[in-house]
Amino acid sequence: MRPHKRKRILAATCIRCMAWGPGSVLRAYPPDPDNAALVYYQAFLLLVPLESEQKEAVAEFSRGERELTDEIRETVGQFRSAIEYSLTASQMRTCSWGLRLSLGFNASLPHLAQLRSLSRVLLADARIRAADGAWREAFERCLAVKRIGKHVGDDVIISMLVAGSLDGAANEVIGDLLGAMPADEEMLAWLKSELATLSSDPLTAGRTLEYEREVAMETMRPENRELLIHVFEGMGTQITPKQVAQVDEQLLARNRDHYDRFITSIQTILSTP
């Protein structure tokens, strides 16, 4: 190909690319995930391993039990990428963790501990931002933790407990920030609106209790004796051979009936205005 012809082709290609514009170029990339869980899982991988002393320092600082130091600032700064991924994930509507809840009491929930770690980092970073006068960013991190609590969901009781814990921790930091920030009517109006939006869609225990009832009814069967022993031992209860020998259908039937009435009573209480 002659040099001048090659130049004309190159020039035409450049003009065509400029005509498309940057928006068209971006469309060449695959779309970002629309499932928050996938982004959270990436944030987990970005968590930097810490020594026990560093973990304790960050946790205590996030709760307002320790003053900000250069060491804490540096430690939290290592989580910049994990924080950004968490903030992005918290803004997404859909969050499906892909849990194998059909395994019942054997289902693993490894994401819960990781979410607690992420939330501690976010709340620690919120306090750092507040110390630097970046109040909007500080509140945004607290709101992100509250949204993470929503994403934890209400599939099982332990999930609801973790969600409540995260929400409570975020509220504690928000309260501390409100007590320290300068007067800012616009900021308060924005925060009030954000909190109202989050409060409009609360987690509920209805589906959670039904799931727990179903799992318990299926698990408390003679053929699941070994699983039951494993569950009790996992809670720190030692089962003696004599106790194992006493586990029969009659005993389990009484326990199923007791548990069923127990769950029903809780549902009645929760449904009472």
What is the predicted function of each stretch?
Residues 2, 7-9, 16-273:
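Short acidic linear motifs
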